[in-house]
Amino acid sequence: GEAYPYVDVGVSPAPASRDLPIWVGGSGAAAWRRTGRRGDGYIPMGATRDQYPEIIATIRRAAEEAGRGGVGFDIGIMPGWAYIGEPPEDLPPAWLTGPPEKIAEELRADRAVGANAFHLKFRARTIEEYLDQLAAFGEQVRPLL
């Protein structure tokens, strides 16, 4: 597409690699086709698991039509807020809560329909609680995946 020059603009921290993947986010067939034509990955917004086969097929078809057949791409899942364990009552609701086994089961179900990347956001009231949630994911959920 068109490019626009900017003066005295920077991005920090600088990317670790010059080969940056293009992730497309959105909902609907137009976003799926755009991913096939230009993207390296897709994050569906509000898609359900039963939509993933159609999403993946549409991306592959658009990639073929754009001469990008055989190019790999990632499909993500963004399930929303998570809390490992029983969330405190004063915490805003989270979509994915419960013991590590339940969270791993949900993420495995996403993988079974084609998602190979996920974006989880953890609910927490303090930075310490947030860091505890990250540690719990790494130590208790990740080994189950």
How would you describe each model-predicted region?
Residues 1-145:
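Active-site-adjacent structural elements that line small-molecule/cofactor binding pockets in enzymes
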